[in-house]
């Protein structure tokens, strides 16, 4: 079956007018939604679609710009504390209520406002972004609100998008009468054959393939304390390097910093892509503790680098890493896995590395993700002109 992108231009369905909301903007400089919005929107624009990505501004009137063929439309984000994100999302939804064939909202915090485009006949998709309400950073009222918005999203949206099949299955099970849900994964950039420059390792006093690394935000659901405990039980000589902004401003971060030593090293956030690729690529193994959410970008990037992955045992991580990772549920299990990594590293590293890269190249390339989105968008907006969906399309 041919992809939409492979159809002769003269025979392709007419281009779509697509709005992407819910990110801080592009080019990406913050997190997963921003990277997703950039990678998807640029590729859709290259295929002839008129794509608009909404971006936040601290000013009331900022003219639109164009970034690699994508219109960037700015809306003010007020300084209202936690409510500022909601106000920004609502402003974007109000502006996008007409003039588009499809509005794609990243996140469901403003799900109730998705009715504004819908009442004017515009389909609205909502990316459900994992179990956002379960994240420890939210207080009780915020969690209750987000749980309510998850429910609202199931009938405010025309379609729900999940970046993990486990999330899509949960939506169908918990909200059987809600909007249809589709699984389209997050993407990653496969590593080139060129070996990254290892000179940056000296910045952190590291030697290639003689350290273990974690890249994560310091939040309880990412299991950093359990990873540190398991590492200490392991008792090996390779240091544990934790990449993330652990500044000690929260009680959890203060607990983490109590374990700082020559063996447990907190190097702060690394935002330069080349430096981050370096510290990942030359790690003996990558420890992944994330447990809330769907397809995790950090896990995909580690696999794209060819890391030997040891991941927290949950459906989301198993769905992504499959047989290219080892899994742990307790600190003692992690210690056992790390003993195996050290003992078998020279024997199995090349094979494990290639398996991880193969999974990314087969299932998680941005071009493949864009193919899936484009086919589903045409099925939604131009059903009479759309090519057939893949057999597993929903």
Question: Model-derived features: where do they sit?
Answer:
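Conserved donor-binding/catalytic core segment of Leloir-type glycosyltransferases
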Residues: 19-21, 202-235, 241
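Aromatic "clamp/platform" in nucleotide-sugar-dependent glycosyltransferases that forms part
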Residues: 290-291
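A short, active-site helix/loop in glycosyltransferases that binds the activated sugar's phosphate group
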Residues: 154-181, 188-190
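Short hydrophobic beta-strand element within catalytic cores of glycosyltransferases
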Residues: 285, 304, 308-311
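Nucleotide-activated donor-binding/catalytic signature segment of Leloir-type glycosyltransferases, i.e.
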Residues: 253-274
């Amino acid at each position: 079956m041919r992809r939409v992108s492979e159809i002769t231009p003269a025979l392709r369905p007419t281009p779509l007018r697509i709005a992407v909301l819910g990110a801080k903007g592009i080019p990406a400089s913050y997190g997963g939604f921003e990277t997703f919005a950039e990678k998807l929107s640029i590729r859709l624009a290259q295929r002839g679609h008129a794509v608009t990505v909404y971006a936040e501004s601290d000013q009331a009137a900022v003219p639109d710009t164009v970034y690699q063929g994508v219109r960037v439309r700015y809306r003010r984000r007020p300084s209202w504390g936690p409510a500022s994100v909601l106000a920004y999302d609502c402003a974007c939804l109000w502006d996008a209520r007409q003039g588009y064939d499809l509005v794609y909202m990243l996140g469901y915090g403003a799900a109730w406002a998705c009715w504004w485009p819908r009442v004017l006949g515009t389909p609205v998709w909502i990316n459900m972004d994992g179990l956002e309400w379960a994240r420890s950073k939210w207080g009780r009222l915020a969690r209750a609100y987000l749980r309510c918005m998850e429910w609202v999203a199931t009938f405010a949206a025309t379609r729900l998008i999940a970046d993990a099949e486990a999330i899509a299955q949960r939506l169908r099970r918990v909200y059987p009468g809600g909007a249809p849900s589709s699984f389209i994964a997050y993407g990653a950039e496969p590593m080139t054959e060129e070996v990254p420059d290892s000179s940056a390792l000296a910045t952190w006093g590291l030697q290639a393939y003689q350290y273990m690394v974690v890249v994560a935000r310091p939040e309880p659901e990412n299991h950093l304390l359990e990873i540190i405990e398991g590492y200490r039980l392991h008792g090996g000589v390779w240091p544990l390097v934790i990449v993330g902004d652990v500044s000690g401003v929260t009680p959890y971060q203060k607990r983490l910093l109590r374990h700082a030593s020559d063996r447990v090293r907190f190097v702060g956030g690394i935002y330069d892509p080349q430096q981050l690729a370096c510290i990942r690529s030359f790690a003996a193994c990558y420890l992944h503790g994330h447990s809330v959410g769907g397809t995790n970008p950090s896990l995909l990037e580690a696999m794209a680098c060819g890391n030997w992955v040891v991941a927290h045992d949950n459906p989301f991580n198993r769905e992504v890493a499959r047989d290219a990772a080892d899994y742990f549920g307790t600190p003692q299990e992690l210690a056992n896995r790390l003993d195996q990594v050290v003992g078998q590293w020279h024997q199995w590293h090349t094979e494990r590395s290639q398996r991880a890269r193969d999974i990314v190249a087969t299932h998680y390339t941005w071009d493949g993700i864009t193919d899936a989105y484009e086919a589903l968008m045409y099925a939604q907006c131009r059903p009479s002109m759309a090519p057939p969906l893949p057999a597993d399309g929903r």
